[in-house]
């Protein structure tokens, strides 16, 4: 454990941020899995709605600094490609 007051505070702050980021990433993975399940099932209308939900969450994660903007753009692009590849 750190001895300096400011480093002790940073340890606590970093832990709070880590837990918050973990929750955001977990929600992203959950919504992304739901989207991919709908694509596999062939339900295009529901998949489109779910993609909008997931894309919005990716944008929010970028705004919060959880993800890099290029990472989110890549994931949204792949989701769009999967959606467009549906019959």
Curated annotation (Swiss-Prot):
It comes from the Bacteria. Binds directly to 16S ribosomal RNA. Belongs to the bacterial ribosomal protein bS20 family. One of its GO terms (biological process) is translation. GO terms for molecular function: small ribosomal subunit rRNA binding; structural constituent of ribosome. GO terms for cellular component: cytosol; small ribosomal subunit. Pfam families: Ribosomal_S20p (PF01649). Gene3D superfamilies: Ribosomal protein S20. The gene is rpsT. Keywords: Ribonucleoprotein, Ribosomal protein, RNA-binding, rRNA-binding. PANTHER family: 30S RIBOSOMAL PROTEIN S20, SMALL RIBOSOMAL SUBUNIT PROTEIN BS20C. It comes from Corynebacterium urealyticum (strain ATCC 43042 / DSM 7109). The lineage of its organism: Bacteria, Bacillati, Actinomycetota, Actinomycetes, Mycobacteriales. This is Small ribosomal subunit protein bS20.
């Amino acid at each position: 454990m750190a001895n300096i007051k400011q480093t002790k505070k940073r340890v606590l702050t970093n832990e709070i941020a880590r837990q918050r980021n973990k929750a955001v990433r977990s929600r992203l993975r959950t919504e992304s899995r739901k989207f991919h399940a709908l694509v596999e099932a062939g339900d295009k209308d529901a998949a489109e709605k779910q993609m909008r939900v997931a894309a919005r969450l990716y944008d929010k994660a970028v705004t919060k600094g959880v993800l890099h903007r290029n990472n989110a753009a890549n994931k949204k692009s792949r989701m769009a490609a999967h959606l467009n590849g549906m019959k």
